[in-house]
Amino acid sequence: MRSGKRIISVLAAVVLMMLPAGCDFMRITEDLSDCATLFSVKYNVTLRTNLTTQVQTVLRSRFENEVADLLEDSLKNIFREYAHDVDLSFYPGEERSFHDSHIMDAGQATYSLELPVNDYRHLALANLADEVEVDLTQSQWVQRSYLSQIVGDTIQGHNTGLFTARQDMNILGNVDQEFDVTLYMVNCASILVIRTDSVGYSQGVAYRDCQVYSSDFADGFMVNDSTFTHRTNPTVHDFRVTNPPVKREIYYAVTFPSCDTPEEAQTLPDTRADNSQTGSTEEDRIWRKYVYVTLPNGDVTRTIINVKMPLQAGQVMIIYAYMRPDGSIYSPNVEVSTSVSLKWKDGLDIETGE
């Protein structure tokens, strides 16, 4: 080894508990310094979720096993301890000095790289490459690094599970060091299961179309501070699960979390134009789903589902509901209330799916 310089290797091991382990190696030699030391970083992608509990409590307890299996299959590529790609940034000060993006697609990955000896703030993110609704912006500066949801009055939900971590690293000279960094999920999912064979209507309700939207969720995430922003309040068009069981409809939206309290939720901008027609909704609600059912005669029934429980990062909430013959939706869940508008709005301004 030449005097004044040592090889620096960084071990970046992403431990994925549900996947087989594999390794990949990369050497990065840009921006080297004569002051360097050996250190390692172990990355753990950790999912703390209540998905299985929600499915068991809300669906399987009602013998909705086919719905439960279909829903779990639909969400399996989002709610999992897995990193398709990682984005790694190191900041000796406000501005970034080193950055690496790497496609992983494995349960475990090891990187060898060289960095100057220094005090670093390290930000790590996973699964950004395939996420079309969220961008990483201003990541050149540690305090501004931001997961920004695309701007729009109506947007689609996220299609990947997003994980982030942040940690201070004091890289010393002539000392072998190892750091443990855990990445946690920052998005969540709200799910609506609708039965169209309500009590007394075993043949099922006749309707032409059903569309579901969600609102009152965060629009971004400050990576360094680990805080969510609510600068705007976009409406998210829920995804409809295809080929549901007979007389069932399944919708979900993967988003950033909601506010924590009704008081915070009441301060959000209300961007849905149709809300002005009916005035304010429940004051104790934290987030909402809007259900638009088009009946065979063309009339539209709108139901606002007001949810009183916060939806946090990594979590899911399943709302089990029923459709009445007039197209209205009701749920036995005590944590939700509904507001119904029959023959809602001439000149419907929503996507009808037709």
Segments (PLM) and residue ranges:
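Structured interaction patches on ligand/partner-binding surfaces of diverse proteins
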Residues: 105-107, 129-178, 298-329
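Sec-dependent bacterial lipoprotein signal peptides
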Residues: 1-24
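Tryptophan-paired
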Residues: 71-136, 203-315, 349-354
